[in-house]
Curated annotation (Swiss-Prot):
Pathway: Amino-acid biosynthesis; L-proline biosynthesis; L-glutamate 5-semialdehyde from L-glutamate: step 2/2. It holds the Pfam family Aldedh. One of its GO terms (molecular function) is NADP binding. It is an enzyme of class 1 (oxidoreductase). This is Gamma-glutamyl phosphate reductase. Keywords: Amino-acid biosynthesis, Cytoplasm, NADP, Oxidoreductase, Proline biosynthesis. PROSITE patterns: PROA (PS01223). One of its GO terms (cellular component) is cytoplasm.
Length: 418
């Protein structure tokens, strides 16, 4: 067994020990730790920024949107601290009993929420994920092992150290938050195989990262993130509403997973509405790639290829298709989407209900932007990711998604008779 594997197993054992302690903490103790972490981020902002500067220097040749996600400022650190404080205000899911009842044998059965144990996070060069994950796992009573992108290594190490020291200063386990400092793929693969130490693995990043984790991990995985999201403009759509929703969903933050990537429009309204929607998008710098029917209506569009329908652009690009029916739109969406967020724009109630029932996605909208798929917008507070799978958690994952169920049964000598 090589040294790296031994180191990861040592981290796993330390995380398990920390998780046992975290599971016994009161909500007050957890909130005390969170407030200490928030204060430490602000106190040590200069140290964090110095580390981030080293990462930015090494990443200067990378795309601007990548560098922007990597960059930290005092304002962004203040936002991180505010986010941690906000987590402290959220209800503690482990302090609640979901339901309780007495069965025919006189047993009192209570269904409670308990921490998952040790959460592993594999994510790309987004230092804010380090803080978000630490805060959410701590509040829900879990330890976390973090493995961020190599481009953010100095930033992540500085952040993790600040958070660990803040916990230790309050007499709380510093191993509640651990960071893997070897950014190699080999170590990431070994992390995916830490069965017995990591209870669940959550990848956050692009399609390639998520696919690699899902295919290679032997640890249970919650699949998150990739968002090939569609907006379908129905034959009964209001033009003004369609323009506003499509532009918001595509333009506001094109690099995030809840941005719309595809526009489907019913043939009955395409001649009237598509030129207006297309102009609004193009006025915001969006490159449109259309099928033959869309390009016949808006000749300035580029030709869409078969690959376009399955591509998450994360950029100011949108593919457009004209469909003859809602059934065709639903069939296309279910064939090409990533089960993230899908929307219909319509004034027809029956069409809206058909869309809600037949589209397979974590979140399905009627007359609203896909950009609302977010823990804060759903009232969950911060989120650790957006699950696109069906088991355990689906959609924006807040604190409750980082817990599981335990049944506590109280008796007074009952034995089963048959």
């Amino acid at each position: 067994m090589d040294a790296t594997t031994i180191d990861l197993e040592q981290m796993g054992r330390a995380a398990k020990t920390a998780a046992m302690t975290l599971g016994q903490l009161t909500t007050l103790q957890k909130n005390t730790g969170l407030l200490a972490m928030a204060a430490a981020l602000e106190t040590h902002a200069d140290t964090i920024l110095a580390a981030n500067k080293a990462d930015l220097a090494a990443a200067s040749a990378l795309p601007e949107k990548f560098v922007d996600r990597l960059a930290l400022t005092k304002a962004r650190i203040a936002d991180m601290a505010a986010g941690v404080r906000q987590v402290a205000t959220l209800d503690d899911p482990t302090a609640q009993t979901d339901r309780a009842w007495v069965n025919e044998a006189g047993l009192t059965i209570a269904q409670k929420r308990v921490p998952l144990g040790v959460v592993g996070m594999i994510y790309e060069a987004r230092p804010n994920v380090t803080v978000d994950a630490a805060a959410l796992t701590f509040k829900s009573g879990n330890a976390v092992i973090l493995r961020g992108g190599k481009e953010a290594l100095h930033s992540n190490l500085a952040l993790a150290t600040v958070l660990q020291d803040a916990l230790a200063a309050k007499g709380l386990p510093r191993d509640a938050v651990q960071l893997i400092t070897d950014p190699s793929r080999a170590v990431a693969t070994q992390m995916m195989h830490l069965n017995g130490y990591i209870d669940v693995l959550i990848p956050r990043g692009g399609k390639g990262l998520i696919k690699a984790v899902v295919e290679q991990a032997t640890v249970p995985v919650i699949e998150t993130g990739a968002g090939n999201c569609h907006i379908y403009v129905d034959a009964h759509a209001q033009l003004q509403m369609a323009v506003a929703i499509v532009v918001n969903a595509k333009v506001q933050r094109p690099s995030v997973c809840n941005a719309a990537e595809k526009l489907l429009i019913h043939a009955d309204v395409a001649n009237e509405q598509l030129p207006v929607i297309a102009k609004a998008l193009q006025d915001h710098g969006v490159e449109l790639r259309g099928d033959e029917r869309a390009r016949a209506i808006v000749p300035s569009m580029h030709a869409a290829t078969a690959e376009d329908w399955d591509t998450e652009y994360n950029d100011l690009i949108m593919a457009v298709k004209v469909v003859d029916s809602e059934e065709e739109a639903i069939q296309h969406i279910n064939a090409h989407n990533t089960k993230h967020s899908e929307a219909i724009i319509t004034d027809n109630y029956q069409n809206s209900q058909q869309f809600l029932q037949q589209v397979d996605a974590a979140v399905v909208y009627v007359n609203a932007s896909t950009r609302f798929t977010d823990g804060y917008e759903f009232g969950f507070g911060a989120e650790i990711g957006i699950s696109t799978q069906k088991l355990h958690a689906r959609g924006p994952m807040g604190l409750a998604a980082l817990t599981t169920i335990k049944y506590q049964v109280l008796g007074n000598g009952q034995i089963r008779k048959n």
